[in-house]
Amino acid sequence: VRTEDGKELDKDGTPTFKAFPEGKVDWYTDAGFLRYSANCLACHGPDGLGSTYAPSLVDALKTLSYGDFLSTVAGGKKNVSASQDLVMPALGTNKNVMCYIDAIYVYLRARADGAVGRGRPENQDPKPAAYSKAEDECMG
């Protein structure tokens, strides 16, 4: 794991979390919780555990690659069966999601790996300057 502009990256360059003792986390994990709660919770349920009409993202992130996660969020997904028609809208143009997609992924990855429990994690790190700059550029 390496840190680049305040963001933790795994050996493949995929954003990842940094857990500290006593349940505290890095900025991205905490920000991801907030953005997930604002944009994803209504369908995928509290803490990423799923609902009657959207899957558990905690379970999905155990096997879903970063690229597949980005593709699904940006392009949407449709699963049709004899009993139900499940549709996730494409969110690729939603700045409230896409400007924070790495933070959302990091939070869900920490949940999937069991590093973060239910509820809001305690923040440890200050907001990285690079995060603020990227946020300002993305949101316009």
Regions found by a protein language model. Give the residues of each.
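Electrostatic cytochrome c docking/interface patches
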Residues: 1-35
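Short charge-dense sequence patches
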Residues: 16-26, 50-61
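Solvent-exposed, acidic/flexible segments
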Residues: 25, 29, 33, 62, ...
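Sequence context surrounding c-type heme c attachment/ligation sites in exported
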Residues: 30-41, 50-51, 64-68, 121-123
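The canonical Cys-X-X-Cys-His
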Residues: 36-46, 69, 73, 88, ...
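Axial heme c-ligation environment in periplasmic c-type cytochrome domains
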Residues: 51-58, 76-103, 108-129
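Short alpha-helix boundary/capping motifs
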Residues: 64-72, 85, 116, 132-136
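Short, low-complexity, Pro/Ser/Thr/Gly-rich segments in the mature regions of secreted, periplasmic
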Residues: 125-140
